[in-house]
Amino acid sequence: MFDKKLLESSELYDKRYRNFSTLIILPLFILLVGGVIFTFFAHKELTVISTGSIEPTKIVAKIQSTNANPIIENNLKEGKVVKENSLLLKYNGTPEQTQLSELLTQKKQVLDKKAQLDLLQKSLTNEKNEFPTTDSFGYEKSFENYESQVKSLEATIQKSNQAVEDQNKSTESQKQAIQNQVATLQQAIQNYSEIENAVSSGGGVSQDNPYLSQYNSYQAQQATLEADLKNQKNPDETAKQATKSQEESLKSQFLSGLASSKDSLKSQIQSFNVQESSLTGSNAYDNSQSSQILTLKTQALSASNKEMTDLNSTLTDLETKISLQKQDDQYSQVFAEQTGVLHVLPDILGMKKIPIGTPIAEIYPLLKAETQVNLTSYIPSTQISGMKVGQKVRFTVQQNLPKPEILTGIIKQIDSAPTAFKEGNAYKVSATTAINAKDLPNIRYGLQGKTVTIIGKKTYFNYFLDKIMGRTS
């Protein structure tokens, strides 16, 4: 007899519930479900990583050479803290005779060039040649090249659209030919069906049926079999059955031939339908002529504006040099105009003579607690779309320090136009941060590091889903 009290024993329950499923699979399943749920609520930061540097928020003063004589005392040193009115350069006391007339000639050339460049801009704006005479700087030729590009663009788009139109006409012509052929085949199937119906159920066949001769031939064969039977004297049952069997066989063969012909025609129709479905017209008409011409015009005006800016800058430099050239030898010494950190331009270090008006150094604000600095980086054009003013930037100093030096700033400016590098175009991004007192020992202007910009967040579920689907953020 089975003792029911054994059902209440702990050994029974232990053996029943302490199995592989409860000890391994169930915990792993719970862990997996928990991990999936975690991906729906936990967020991952989306970042853009680049290389950046610490730059000043402003330039306190710009230092230029005031004399072309040999330098006899040079106190220029990169990163040096200078006080206001401290001596930076001292020149030989004998003033060097320079050619002022050459500077004046250069100024006249720049003014003439500006006048011709202005005519180019007017020609581009009004879309007609505004040059009264041929200029010596090639700007009229530039406008003629622009007009040639516009005409070439118009001709290319017209040719492209004509090709699309011709292709569509050819496609429609082919479709119509196929449809006509299909209609002919369908009529042939109807003609065969008419004969098939006449053979099967005794219907009539129209006289204009092109396959009437086949039907007449079949009827003639049937009539021959019946005539042979009638010509026999007193045919027995066996002869009658043989004749009937021959008639059925003849009918079956004739119907089979009709069905085979119909199937062949249907196969041809199906093939034509496939051909017709593969013939598609094109709507790829190019309607971008106006926008492309506007783009050409904008590019040409942008290039001329940049050149005008360069000419204005050159003119300003020349006027500065002329003004300096007219000064007495009182400019035999250069002093710091403000207190700050000295940044010597790379090409100046080690020079014994520096032409008048040449920029030689810049003075940056002193680095002290709460000093504002820029975290400047260049972001490739392929990654700039997600970056906005106001986003956070983490800057990590790339040095062997016991503890990583991390600065956090806010993006204040993103250049509207990219800067060209050998590796490609990149946009300058400037973020502002304040230096803490504890960070001062490790911070210098020009210090490079890694910048990480947080451009958004998404759940880990969406992040892994995008990875699987091949989508990029």
Curated annotation (Swiss-Prot):
<dbReference type="InterPro" id="IPR005696">
    <property type="entry name" value="MesE/LcnD"/>
</dbReference>
<comment type="function">
    <text>Involved in the secretion of a lactococcin.</text>
</comment>
<dbReference type="InterPro" id="IPR006144">
    <property type="entry name" value="Secretion_HlyD_CS"/>
</dbReference>
<keyword id="KW-0813">Transport</keyword>
<keyword id="KW-0080">Bacteriocin transport</keyword>
<keyword id="KW-0472">Membrane</keyword>
<feature type="topological domain" description="Cytoplasmic">
    <location>
        <begin position="1"/>
        <end position="21"/>
    </location>
</feature>
<keyword id="KW-0812">Transmembrane</keyword>
<dbReference type="GO" id="GO:0005886">
    <property type="term" value="C:plasma membrane"/>
</dbReference>
<dbReference type="Pfam" id="PF13437">
    <property type="entry name" value="HlyD_3"/>
</dbReference>
<dbReference type="GO" id="GO:0043213">
    <property type="term" value="P:bacteriocin transport"/>
</dbReference>
<keyword id="KW-1003">Cell membrane</keyword>
<comment type="similarity">
    <text>Belongs to the membrane fusion protein (MFP) (TC 8.A.1) family.</text>
</comment>
<feature type="transmembrane region" description="Helical">
    <location>
        <begin position="22"/>
        <end position="44"/>
    </location>
</feature>
<protein>
    <recommendedName>
        <fullName>Lactococcin A secretion protein LcnD-like</fullName>
    </recommendedName>
</protein>
<dbReference type="InterPro" id="IPR050739">
    <property type="entry name" value="MFP"/>
</dbReference>
<keyword id="KW-1133">Transmembrane helix</keyword>
<feature type="topological domain" description="Extracellular">
    <location>
        <begin position="45"/>
        <end position="473"/>
    </location>
</feature>
<keyword id="KW-0653">Protein transport</keyword>
<dbReference type="GO" id="GO:0009306">
    <property type="term" value="P:protein secretion"/>
</dbReference>
